[in-house]
Amino acid sequence: MSTRTEAVKAYLLDLQDRICTALEQEDGSAHFMEDAWTRPAGGGGRTRVIENGTVIEKGGVNFSHVFGSNLPPSASAHRPELAGRGFEALGVSLVIHPHNPHVPTSHANVRFFIAEKEGEEAVWWFGGGFDLTPYYGVEEDCVHWHRVAERACAPFGEDVYPRYKAWCDSYFHLKHRDEPRGIGGLFFDDVNQWDFDTSFAFIRAIGDAFINAYLPIVRRRKAAAYTVQQREFQEFRRGRYVEFNLVYDRGTLFGLQSGGRTESILMSLPPQVRWGYDWKAAPGSEEARLTEYFLTDRDWLAEN
């Protein structure tokens, strides 16, 4: 393992620890269960899952470090020049599904990828981001989420937040339904336009920003009263989350195609979901406002 890879791995393990500790403290009753695993083809990871807490219905914060002699199709499809190279992939990926429909689901991921071939220069890049999926939108929360994202990006250039915000909006889009998964945030891949140290610093800034982006929203909404109907709507909207993860998500596809651990890969799926045939929200309802106002292409910071 190279010095670069060792530094990234140390950071990711520490990030996993810090996020788990913060989430446990916010929940107040549940604790993460750790499941260490190994991958027969090379590598392994630490899966951490929290379930049936006071605030968190189900969540996972996973670390993985896998390696192999050939890239899986999902990784080499848009980089065909890397076919036949050995690879190492390290990352922390998390999804939090709260009980309360007034608390959004959150997702974050930071990862490092390096592909090597004897006699040739190593090719490396970082990827990641974080995004928010509300069920009952609150403008204050959306602005806060994007403000934290913007501040994390600011030291690396004025164009970084707008570019990766737009990429997030484009990526987390359910093409078969022509609707966004949530209100976005940041998404980026193939980050190597800076030198390694700057690129690594950027990834650390994004990883470290997640708790500051999410926990204030959780604190504001976790005690809000909700009805059975609102809970059912949350489960209905969770269906969109499942559809995206199983059809489009690069991380899910990479994990399954590279022989990753299925239980860890599918940890992101919510515990209870519903699909209703051709269900429509009542005009003028909070449920209708979610798609009409919040799940649209908005510049949250320009408007506030």
UniProtKB/Swiss-Prot annotation:
Q: Summarize where substrate binds, as residue positions.
A: 93, 109-111, 259-261
Return the Pfam families for the record: Coprogen_oxidas (PF01218)
Q: Which reaction does it catalyse?
A: coproporphyrinogen III + O2 + 2 H(+) = protoporphyrinogen IX + 2 CO2 + 2 H2O
The reply on keyword Ion transport is no
Q: What is its EC number?
A: 1.3.3.3
Q: Where does it localize?
A: Cytoplasm
Which cellular component, as a GO term, is one annotated location?
A: cytoplasm
- Annotated GO MF terms: coproporphyrinogen oxidase activity; metal ion binding; protein homodimerization activity
Where's the active site on this chain? 107
Give the UniProt keywords, A-Z: Cytoplasm, Heme biosynthesis, Metal-binding, Oxidoreductase, Porphyrin biosynthesis
Predominant localisation class = cytoplasm
Region called Important for dimerization, residue ranges: 241-276
The protein's enzyme class: oxidoreductase
Which residues are marked as site: Important for dimerization? 176
What this protein is reported to do is described as: Involved in the heme biosynthesis. Catalyzes the aerobic oxidative decarboxylation of propionate groups of rings A and B of coproporphyrinogen-III to yield the vinyl groups in protoporphyrinogen-IX.
Which PANTHER family does the record associate with it? COPROPORPHYRINOGEN III OXIDASE, MITOCHONDRIAL (PTHR10755), OXYGEN-DEPENDENT COPROPORPHYRINOGEN-III OXIDASE, MITOCHONDRIAL (PTHR10755:SF0)
Name the record gives this protein: Oxygen-dependent coproporphyrinogen-III oxidase
Q: To which species is this protein native?
A: Pseudomonas syringae pv. syringae (strain B728a)
Q: Which lineage do the record's taxonomy fields give for this organism?
A: Bacteria, Pseudomonadati, Pseudomonadota, Gammaproteobacteria, Pseudomonadales
Annotated gene: hemF
